[in-house]
Swiss-Prot record:
Region feature (Disordered): 182-265, 447-470
Biased composition (Basic and acidic residues): 194-213
BP terms from Gene Ontology: axonemal dynein complex assembly; cerebrospinal fluid circulation; epithelial cilium movement involved in determination of left/right asymmetry; epithelial cilium movement involved in extracellular fluid movement; establishment of localization in cell; flagellated sperm motility; outer dynein arm assembly; protein localization to cilium
Organism of provenance: Xenopus tropicalis (Western clawed frog)
Organism taxonomic ancestry: Eukaryota, Metazoa, Chordata, Craniata, Vertebrata
Annotated keywords: Cell projection, Cilium, Coiled coil, Cytoplasm, Flagellum, Leucine-rich repeat, Repeat
GO CC entries: cytoplasm; cytosol; dynein axonemal particle; extracellular region; motile cilium
LRR repeats: 20-43, 44-65, 66-89, 90-110
SUPFAM superfamilies per record: L domain-like
Protein name: Dynein axonemal assembly factor 11
Coiled-coil boundaries: 177-288
Pfam families in alphabetical order: CS_DNAAF11_C, LRR_9
Classification via InterPro entries: CS_DNAAF11_C, Leu-rich_rpt, LRR_dom_sf, U2A'_phosphoprotein32A_C
Entry's family note: Belongs to the tilB family.
Length: 470
């Protein structure tokens, strides 16, 4: 049974900075509440209260909410309208799909002078003959009933027919109350019968049979007998699950009436199933075998249960291994446990192992683990156990000359790129064409280039009649 608590109200009051005393609106729908309590003491300033889709069977503990304007109690188990006289500012009341059969209980709403909207659709009383006329005549302050506006002519007609309608409503109420009494008695008998069947089924289940077996000669079970026992346990577990499935199927296929008792029974059945499922999952987690990190033969296995990204670098220059494990950035370092062994490394991340076999032996006492503050990665440096002598590459003379003995002076000096001076020379554009030029002295004269003497070809004929070419 879920009850109204201060923690629940504060969680539903986030829009008001989790303040309860000044809260004006709160929604407590679908919380499986069976009672209304503490709200009138903690939230005196409430104007809107949502309590739909719960298991509330009685209207109570709301009379001190003097500023309450809207109360929603749809989809509950309410059978009678009561305890609302103190809600002086109540303007809208929603009792859609409840079990209100006592229609004469609406007389208690005559003191709510501000009531303008009223919803009773989906209740047994809404099927009574003359239901609407009776409500309109009983509550003259109403303007809307079940989402339909009340006209003046309808109000006058309801007031005129009120004596006849009141008698009909009284007869239908008595018939419904007798029916409800029979339903309650039947539900009580069914509940008692199911409890007896449950006790019998519990007694038939295998368990302690009140006898002790202390045979000293049989303290170590036979392997064959042990295998048979495990197989029998698996068979029993499968049979138990099949029985649960059949029981659930039978429950949902069983016809039942829509009553407050059936709603409560369904809710409790679902709660039991949910709890049994949680317990079963916890038991399965407990029964889960531990992860094998080292086999019986002594072989170390690679394990990455957390599925973290990692990289293992062989730093030959420094003769060490560097492991970079991508730990979550916001994970607390106290949840990490690093264990470096000569042949492997194991890291526990929130009790989940990460184990990696190393290519060569390392020195555990000289290893170091560091955590990055920006990325959160775990970097483990593991020096190799066998030291290797390696030759370093000699620096070239040009680099050696440029190395500075005083690093502070080297930082201040500007290094320039050395280039061959000939490569920087600018080409002489004026002397691109190598040709002698003649310059005239004095008055302007026309200079012609001297004709070049060329040898005559063999077929040349000197004809005097042909004039010379100028």
């Amino acid at each position: 049974m879920v009850r109204v608590s201060e923690d629940l109200i504060r969680r539903r009051a986030e829009h008001n900075n989790c303040e309860i005393f000044s809260l004006e609106e709160i929604s407590l729908h679908q919380q499986d509440l069976e009672r209304i309590e503490y709200i009138d003491k903690w939230c005196r300033e409430l104007k809107i209260l949502y309590l739909q889709n719960n298991l509330i069977g009685k209207i109570e503990n709301v009379s001190k909410l003097k500023k309450l304007e809207y109360l929603n109690l749809a989809l509950n188990n309410i059978e009678k309208i009561e305890n609302l006289e103190g809600c002086e500012s109540l303007q809208k009341l929603d009792l859609t799909v409840n079990f209100v059969g006592d229609l004469s209980s609406i007389n208690s709403l005559q003191e709510n002078r501000q009531l303008r909207e009223f919803y009773l659709v989906g209740n047994p009383c809404a099927e009574y003959e003359g239901y609407r006329q009776y409500v309109v005549a009983t509550l003259p302050q109403l303007k809307w009933l079940d989402g339909k506006e009340i006209e003046r002519s309808e109000r006058i007609q309801a007031a005129q027919d009120y004596p006849q309608v009141q008698g009909k409503i009284k007869e239908q109420e008595e018939a419904y109350l007798r029916k409800r009494a029979a339903e309650r008695e039947k539900a009580t008998n069914n509940l008692q019968q199911k409890q007896k069947e449950g006790r019998k089924a519990q007694e038939k289940k295998p368990g302690f049979d009140r006898r002790w077996y202390t045979d000293i000669n049989n303290t170590i079970p036979d392997p064959v007998e042990k295998t048979d026992t495990v197989a029998q346990l698996n068979v029993d577990e499968t049979a138990l699950r099949n029985d649960d499935e059949e029981e659930e199927k039978e429950f949902w296929n069983q016809p039942s009436q829509y009553t407050p008792e059936s709603r409560l029974e369904t809710h409790r059945y679902l709660e039991e199933k949910r709890k049994s499922k949680e317990n079963r999952s916890e038991e399965e987690l407990k029964k889960k075998p531990p992860r094998t990190l080292i086999t019986a033969e002594g072989r170390v296995l690679n394990v990455n249960e957390s599925k973290l990204d990692f990289s293992l670098v062989d730093d030959e220059e420094n003769n060490q291994f560097v492991l970079d494990l991508a730990i979550y950035r916001h994970l607390d370092t106290s949840l990490l446990d690093v264990d470096v062994q000569p042949g492997y490394i194991k890291v526990l991340v929130k009790e989940k192992p990460f184990q990696l076999v190393l290519p060569a032996e390392v020195k555990p006492d000289s290893s170091a683990a560091k955590r990055s503050q920006t990325t959160g990665h775990l970097v483990v440096t593991m020096p190799k156990a066998t030291e290797m002598i390696q030759t370093k590459r000699a620096k070239s003379p040009a680099i050696a000359e440029r190395t500075c003995k005083n690093p502070q002076k080297c930082l201040k000096t500007h290094e320039k790129l050395e280039v061959d001076p000939k490569a920087r020379s600018i080409p002489d554009v004026a002397n691109i064409v190598q040709e002698k030029k003649t310059w005239a002295q004095g008055p302007l004269r026309l200079h012609r280039n001297s004709a070049r003497d060329t040898a005559d070809s063999e077929d040349f004929i000197d004809n005097a009649e042909v004039p010379p070419l100028v």
